[in-house]
Amino acid sequence: MMGACGAVSDEKEPVPSNPPALQTASTGNVHRHYIISPQMGDTVTIDVWTPEGYDGSSRRYPVIYMHDGQNLFDATTTWNHQSWEMDSVIGTLIADGKISVPVIVGIHSVAKSRKGDLMPENALKYLPEKRSEAVDEFLDTTSLRGNAYAAFIVNTLKPRMDALYRLSPERDSTFVMGSSMGGLMSIYAMSEYPETFGAAGCLSTHWIGTLDGNNAFSDAMYAYMDEKLPRDGHHRLYLDHGTTTLDSLYGPSEERMIGLVRSHGYSEERGTLETFVDEGGAHQESSWAARVWRPLQFLLGKK
């Protein structure tokens, strides 16, 4: 949420240092970068939030890579005039001593390519050859770039961020989080790159694919996760959903996925799993803003 303190800054390639201030954030600073993605053949807009005191510190910070970065901080610039209010929520958690102080890397999405960019491509091999027209329409196979997007984060964006910011590069300090299709990409990225991401936060995950009750996509994700989900005891997973609007369709698929995750050793007792049902929560940024403290505390909570 934009407010009176902190700043947003802007930079073009190449980058000698962090870009200067542009706008204000309620706490901390937001720096804007434009990073060329050879994997996707695009230039990707990146917003990096650094906490209060970052410039005067020599410490290294855990980092969360978040999808739909354009919706994280400033409701005045989003399509629906809502944001996750990440700067405000994190500022409160830090002030209350609830979390280790992080850096947030927000990866902007582009509406026309978002679905294809966040699609868990390798899960699609589990789809049946004969499937409904609705499933094929959902897949929109002419624009699938999920593998390229994930590779961009790991092979281009992360090295760049590690060089520009004082981040802890280790797996156990590097997390990925998003909602809806971003929830799918988060668990996918952790599964494809288990050596890079130590945990994933998945809010309102779009397990269902289509809206017609066809389970083909959900079944494919289940089969993919059964094979690829890390099960070494060193990874953690947060899963939630609301109960209204689009989220009202997610319950059965989410419960099935939670059962699978538990069968692979994730559990609350071990501190490797947290789940939540947001009664009345909708499929929108205001609902995610109201409960994002939960995955933040799970990912960053002080031990």
Locations of regions flagged by a protein language model:
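Non-catalytic cap/lid and distal C-terminal segments of serine-dependent acyl enzymes
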Residues: 11-303
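C-terminal motif of bacterial Sec signal peptides marking the signal peptidase cleavage site
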Residues: 2-4
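Bacterial signal peptide processing site
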Residues: 6-9
